[in-house]
């Protein structure tokens, strides 16, 4: 048997991962992941959960087969047997964070009965996302609920970032991605649904954070933008902003403030990243068209060849509940086509 600690060079980390403690890196955002290969007949992981809700789980993908593992909903290190009786050969492995602010977790070690090897995956394209629950992959696994409201009291059981359009698109394009998305996120603080109802927190607070959950044991920590420079940034904000005042966006004075903050963040990212391409979107989740109209105004006001505004075929009209994996894939396919025809040509 061999135990490989988290600081082993064979592990590669993707996403805004806290690497300050090399032997216990913290996976924070939905979709953050660890990749490697291993030779062996079983896989056991040691993780330290940091729960912030009633249910938390993670997943491991071994040679394309996904294993969901429910975590002990308490602080502290625990061992998780992922798979046994595997063929004694080299396996590809991805360990990833399924959910957003339900928890963070520290990766401690991997145990198997063979060798640990680095992943062979290479990326020619880098993506980054800023979005809400749809982008984070919430309730994607509630199959047969397409075009319907979410199951009652689902409690995060159906959340899976692997089936979000964000990760689906990255796989289709063979791209690396950082997904900085959170359910309920809006643009402004004191709007949306994240950390409500008394401490509503928006993208204006989270976009430049590593640890972005105000009530987490880690608090808020700053992100070092030099760690990752994307080629394409997908900005998916505007579907939670109607709370608590759905009519505010119709007021021209408020709309001007909203657009100015949106542009302020976008232009800061544009400067930090040396002018990547931006795609401004909402999603197929039902919402008022006024938000897409305001985003189109932003695109026109910026008047930049680096900034695109994309509307899905069923934009704002496909489902009253979170998009399921089929609906997420619909979005990923459309974005793939748009990117290949307009940016990667």
Task: Pin down the residues of each PLM region.
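A structural motif corresponding to the C-terminal end of an alpha-helix
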Residues: 162-176, 265-277, 299-305
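Structural recognition of the beta-strand scaffold that forms the well-ordered cores
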Residues: 126-130, 135, 177-180, 231-236, ...
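Active-site segments of SGNH/GDSL-like serine hydrolases
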Residues: 234-243, 262-297
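Conserved SGNH/GDSL esterase-like catalytic core that processes O-acyl groups on lipids
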Residues: 151-251, 286-289, 326
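Alpha-helical scaffolding within the catalytic cores
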Residues: 14, 214-225, 263-268, 293-298
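Extracellular serine-dependent O-acyl
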Residues: 277-345
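Solvent-exposed, polar/charged alpha-helical surfaces in well-ordered, non-transmembrane soluble domains
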Residues: 167, 171, 260-267, 293, ...
């Amino acid at each position: 048997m061999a135990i490989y600690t988290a600081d082993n060079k064979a592990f590669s980390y993707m996403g805004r991962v806290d690497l300050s403690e090399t032997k216990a890196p913290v996976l924070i955002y939905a979709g953050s992941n660890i990749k490697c290969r291993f030779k062996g007949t079983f896989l056991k992981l040691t993780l330290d959960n940091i729960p912030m809700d009633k249910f938390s789980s993670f997943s491991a993908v071994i040679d394309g087969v996904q294993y969901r593992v429910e975590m002990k909903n308490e602080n502290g290190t625990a061992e998780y047997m992922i798979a046994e009786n595997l063929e004694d050969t080299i396996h590809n492995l991805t360990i990833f964070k399924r959910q957003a602010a339900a928890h963070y977790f520290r990766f401690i070690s991997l145990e198997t009965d063979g060798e640990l090897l680095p992943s062979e995956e290479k990326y020619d394209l880098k993506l980054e996302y800023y979005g809400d629950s749809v982008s984070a992959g919430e309730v994607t696994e509630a199959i047969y609920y397409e075009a319907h409201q979410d199951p009652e009291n689902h409690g995060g059981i159906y959340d899976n970032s692997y089936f979000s359009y964000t990760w689906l698109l990255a796989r289709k394009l063979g791209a690396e991605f950082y997904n900085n998305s959170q359910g309920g996120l809006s643009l402004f603080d004191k709007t949306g649904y994240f950390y409500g109802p008394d401490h509503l927190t928006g993208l204006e607070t989270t976009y430049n954070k590593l640890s972005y959950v105000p009530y987490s044991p880690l608090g808020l920590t700053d992100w070092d933008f030099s760690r990752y420079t994307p080629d394409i940034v997908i900005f998916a904000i505007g579907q939670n902003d109607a709370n608590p005042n759905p009519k505010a966006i119709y007021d021209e004075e408020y709309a001007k403030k909203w657009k100015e903050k949106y542009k302020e963040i976008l232009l800061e990212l544009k400067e930090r990243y040396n002018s990547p391409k931006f795609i401004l979107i909402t999603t197929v989740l039902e919402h008022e068209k006024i938000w897409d109209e305001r985003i189109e105004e932003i695109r026109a006001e910026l008047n930049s060849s680096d900034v695109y505004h994309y509307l899905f075929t069923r934009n704002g009209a496909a489902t009253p509940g979170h998009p399921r994996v089929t609906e997420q894939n619909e979005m990923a396919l459309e974005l793939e086509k748009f990117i290949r025809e307009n940016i990667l040509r």
